[in-house]
C-alpha cells in the first residue's frame, strides 16, 4: 500500500502570473493498493462531482506515468481523500495530478526523481505554477524552457500565515482564462516584471513591508474582477485590515491574504464581510506554507 499527501496551492501569486506558486497546509490524500478488481473510494470534504471511474484525474495521471516508464498497469483500489475545494483556485487539479504521479512512481519502485515527475505533471496540467509547489513545497518559481520546466524553491517556509477566503461558487480555469486579453501593454508588462522581482526579494529576505507592493498585479486580477463580485474591494479591505499583501488565488474565486497570526482573525472577518456585502458567502481557511510538498506518508 502507498499513501501520498498533497498540498493545496495558490498560483499566479501576486504578479507572478503562470510562474509563482505557494504550497498550503490543506491536503488531499491518495492511497493505492493491489486489489482483485479496480475500484475508487471517495472521502473527505469535497467528493461531489469527482469521478469514481477510469476518467478520474488521479487514475489517469497514474496510468500516464506507468506508460512512460513501461510499467504494466496493475489492478488496484484507490482511496481518494479530497479536502481541497475544487474549481476554486486552490490547485485541486494539480493535487490530483501530482498525487497520482507520486503514488504511481512509489508503487512502481520510485524510479523517477521529483524533477522527472515535474516534467510529466507539467505536460498534463499545461502550466507549472501549481504543480511545482504541489510537488516541491514552499513558494516556487517555475518557468518552461523549450520542452522542460525549471523550478526552484524561493522560500520553503516563510514566516507568515496564508488566509484563503473561499467563496461558495465554482469558477473553472477555462472560463477565467477566457476573459484575459490576447496582448498587454508594455507598461503593464514592466509593472508586473518589476513587482515579481520585488516579491521574490521580499520572500527571500522575509521583508514583509515589501509584500503589499510586491503582490500587486495588472495582468489578470482586474480582468477577472467581473467574475468575482467585490474582488477589488476585498483585496483592499484585506490590506486596510492589516494583511501584508493580498491577491486573487490562481484563477479564482478564492482570495488570498498574507497575514501575521495575531491579525488573521480581523483580516478574515473583514474579507468575509466584504464579500457578503456583494451577496457572497465564503469560508475562511487559515493556513501555513507547506514546506514539504507531495510526500509519501
From Swiss-Prot:
**Gene3D superfamilies xref list:** 3.30.230.10, GHMP kinase, C-terminal domain
Report the domain of life of the source organism.
Bacteria
GO biological process per UniProt: threonine biosynthetic process
Pathway of action: Amino-acid biosynthesis; L-threonine biosynthesis; L-threonine from L-aspartate: step 4/5
InterPro entries in alphabetical order: GHMP_kinase_C_dom, GHMP_kinase_C_sf, GHMP_kinase_N_dom, GHMP_knse_ATP-bd_CS, Homoserine_kinase, Ribosomal_Su5_D2-typ_SF, Ribsml_uS5_D2-typ_fold_subgr
Q: What is its main location?
A: cytoplasm
Sorted UniProt keywords: Amino-acid biosynthesis, ATP-binding, Cytoplasm, Kinase, Nucleotide-binding, Threonine biosynthesis, Transferase
For this chain, the annotated S-S bridges are none
Query: What EC number(s) are associated with this protein in UniProt?
Result: 2.7.1.39
Under the heading PROSITE patterns, the entry gives: GHMP_KINASES_ATP (PS00627)
User: Where does the chain bind ATP?
Assistant: 85-95
Localization in the cell: Cytoplasm
Q: One cellular component GO annotation, for this chain's record? A: cytoplasm
Q: In which family does this protein belong, per the annotation? A: Belongs to the GHMP kinase family. Homoserine kinase subfamily.
Task of the protein = Catalyzes the ATP-dependent phosphorylation of L-homoserine to L-homoserine phosphate.
Which NCBIfam families does the UniProt entry name for this protein? PRK01212.1-4, thrB
Give the protein's recorded name.
Homoserine kinase
